[in-house]
């Protein structure tokens, strides 16, 4: 499902002494099935932007066209848009409320008017895709789970509604390295299983480099960079000027390059760096 944002501006508390422009004439197009990362320093406008795409905030001016429908129009039922655009907030485990995992995940699909068989099918599929065995976990209380497992339940609750667009606000925030890896792997599987359009908000450049196809960079309410991983992370000076950085491994390979090692500069993941460094070592061994 395509998303087109045209001249979007949002002003908090207009006309008051606390007036603040959070979005300033933003123009973005996202194609059906894209995996887009949204990055920016705290206060850059990321969260405000994603809440507009879900219809939680009303634009001060501009248009948001989702699947051909302008959701800023007064005639549009936002409840219908939210069935198509799922939003998983940061620390979504705080939104869990039911006595069992199955009931919690089933809450959304039930409100779509599905029958019991359809709801059960969606719950099982969503649990499977986030790595929670249905028979093992369905009757457990979500409050007895680890942080990473709670996060999976919360994501499954949105996924079970089978939205066309899934927005994830820092899905790996606060998790240990293993939990972080697991969640990111599940997000990749969601993209493959449902062919969703995914928008990932993240502060981690390493996470973005691993799984996103395209990166949007926000600063002071504007989208200042838009491109592939390679295109955006090659703009080191611009990123650093707005309080961001490239992945740490990129700084490492650039340091090696400056010492005249024959290694590409545009490396953004540990896996890529490992492969290139192994090539260097093997090449050095051949000359010995």
UniProtKB/Swiss-Prot annotation:
InterPro entries: AAA+_ATPase, ABC_transporter-like_ATP-bd, ABC_transporter-like_CS, ABC_transpr_CbiO/EcfA_su, ECF_ABC_transporter_ATP-bd, EcfA2, P-loop_NTPase. ATP binds at residues 40-47. Residues 3-245 form the ABC transporter domain. GO terms for cellular component: ATP-binding cassette (ABC) transporter complex. Coiled coil: none annotated. The keyword Metal-binding does not apply. Its EC number is 7.-.-.-. Pfam families: ABC_tran. Keywords: ATP-binding, Cell membrane, Membrane, Nucleotide-binding, Translocase, Transport. One of its GO terms (molecular function) is ATP binding. It comes from the Bacteria. It is a peripheral membrane protein. It is an enzyme of class 7 (translocase). It is found in: Cell membrane. The keyword Cytoplasm does not apply. ATP-binding (A) component of a common energy-coupling factor (ECF) ABC-transporter complex. Unlike classic ABC transporters this ECF transporter provides the energy necessary to transport a number of different substrates. Forms a stable energy-coupling factor (ECF) transporter complex composed of 2 membrane-embedded substrate-binding proteins (S component), 2 ATP-binding proteins (A component) and 2 transmembrane proteins (T component). Belongs to the ABC transporter superfamily. Energy-coupling factor EcfA family. PANTHER family: ENERGY-COUPLING FACTOR TRANSPORTER ATP-BINDING PROTEIN ECFA2, HEAVY METAL TRANSPORTER. This is Energy-coupling factor transporter ATP-binding protein EcfA2. It comes from Clostridium novyi (strain NT).
